[in-house]
Regions:
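Conserved N-terminal phosphate-binding loop of PLP-dependent enzymes in the Aspartate aminotransferase
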Residues: 7-462
């Protein structure tokens, strides 16, 4: 790798969230980790295969409960990331109890060609709670595999192989799922990926390459791009995207209605990746309820109750035509333990009305953040739905230059105060807490965040 390519690779890593190898990470490690934690830190570095975004680690965890993670030294952090698995809260007692009951019943694995009651009950439950018309499920161990099942289904039922997805999107780390993803970080250096994978711009109303200010203009240009590809590439099997991007960017309903119309006109399936956004995150049980019903809905992460790895797809009866093909065929396709965890998590979210809670608390959080934006010029833009929120930090409101270094310092200052979150694109602070978070806990988190922003704006380093 040349010196120039190394610099480019480093720039890409910083923009896509890798703060684990910077001098500030080293300072955090020296200031906050005990000798015992440092010993395990070094063991982790010695035995795991190193990779960007997760090596070296930030800390060593010993526990998690509700909205909190706890490190080896006993310090608790309000966790606003959770890798998207923690909608019902970490170590949810009802999910744990359901798993224990299933363990006690003695069915922990279901061989192929057999079924079991928890798996059937889960498929039935998903048919009841997903948007109208979605009624056929298939399960697998993780989100990457679920994305690839959706792609396989689209190829089989359309007889086509090409896809449209979005630049800067992430749909998993598997070869196929990374191939349709739009993050260079996950396919750089791998050579040819999935053939027929086309990418277009996502409708970002704050940052778009054309400098448009009106949502209608951004939507129109993004839809024009999609139709241009569809006209020139007739073998299109599907358009795949998150209803709301992970950043998050919240498109208009008009935009997704336009995409769905193009899919119908050109014979492609619409696949929604709700691996992060499903199960109450955006203020509705599924993010697609804000927009349109897709042909295939992809679920994962919190589907396993925050305990077990589990994912799947839900689609329409119309596409239940591939009895002569294998779409997933995973060893743990109908895992009874995972199904029991998923059922308990869904019941917990429903009985406690966590989707409604997410909508109400999310609106309050956005209101507070908008007030903070008036006081802090570094906050360029705030966006989100429910408890799926992003804060775009900038150096200058006229140029919208990304405040990458400042965002990193703010993150480490917040960690020292007991607040954990993830940065995306180098400068966007993402807030995705467990849905059980209270207003008082959210206020505490926002107070910590504002303290850190204020210090950085006044010129304090880390």
């Amino acid at each position: 790798m040349t010196g120039e390519s190394k610099l480019e690779d480093r720039r890409m890593q910083r923009e896509q969230g890798d703060v684990n190898t910077t001098p500030n990470r080293r300072k955090y490690w020296e200031r906050n980790l005990s000798p015992e934690a440092r010993r395990w830190f070094e063991e982790d570095a010695r035995y795991f295969l190193h990779q960007s975004l997760s090596t070296p680690v930030l800390n060593v965890l010993a526990g998690a409960e509700g909205i909190y993670i706890r490190d080896l030294d006993g310090k608790r952090f309000i966790d606003m990331h959770g890798n998207g698995v923690h909608n019902a809260g970490f170590n949810n007692p009802e999910v744990i109890a359901a798993i224990r009951r299933q363990l006690d019943e003695g069915l922990t694995f279901c061989p192929r060609r057999y079924t079991n009651i928890p798996a059937i009950q889960l498929a039935k439950k998903l048919a009841e709670i997903t948007p109208a018309g979605l009624c056929r499920s298939l399960f697998c161990p993780g989100g990457s595999e679920a994305i690839e099942m959706a792609l396989t289904l689209a190829r089989q039922v359309t007889g086509r192989f090409k896809t449209i997805s979005f630049w800067d999107s992430f749909h998993g780390a598997g070869f196929g799922s990374a191939g349709i993803g739009g993050e260079e970080h996950f396919h750089g250096g791998l050579g040819p990926m999935m053939p027929g994978s086309f990418h277009v711009e996502f409708p970002n109303y704050y940052r778009n390459p054309w400098g448009f200010d009106r949502e209608e203009d951004v939507d129109a240009e993004c839809l024009r791009q999609i139709e241009l590809v569809l006209r020139r590439e007739p073998e299109m099997s599907a358009i795949i995207g998150e209803p709301i991007s992970a950043t998050p960017v919240v498109p208009s309903r008009r935009y997704w209605e336009g995409v769905q119309d193009l899919c119908r006109r050109y014979g492609a399936l619409l696949i929604f990746d709700e691996i992060i956004e499903g199960f109450g995150r955006t203020g509705k049980m599924f993010a697609s309820e804000h927009f349109v019903t897709p042909d295939v809905l992809v679920l994962g992460k919190s589907l396993g109750g925050g305990v077990l790895p589990f994912a799947g797809i839900v689609t329409h009866e119309h596409y239940n035509t591939l009895q002569h093909r294998s779409i997933g065929h995973y060893t743990h396709e109908k895992n009874a333990l995972c199904a029991a965890a998923a059922l308990a998590e869904i019941e917990f979210i429903e009985t406690r009305r966590l989707a409604d809670h997410s909508a109400a608390l999310g609106a309050y959080t956005l209101q507070r953040l908008n007030q903070m934006q008036e006081r802090h010029p570094m906050i360029g833009h705030v966006a989100g739905l429910g408890l799926h929120i992003g804060i775009d930090l900038i150096k200058d409101r006229a140029t919208k230059e990304r405040a990458v270094d400042e965002a990193e310092i703010i993150m480490f200052k917040c960690l020292e105060r007991g607040l954990s979150f993830k940065t995306i694109d180098g400068n966007v602070l993402t807030l995705r807490p467990a849905l059980v978070i209270t207003r008082e806990e959210m206020d505490r988190a926002l107070d910590i965040l504002e303290e850190a922003i204020d210090e950085v704006e006044r010129g304090q380093s880390y």
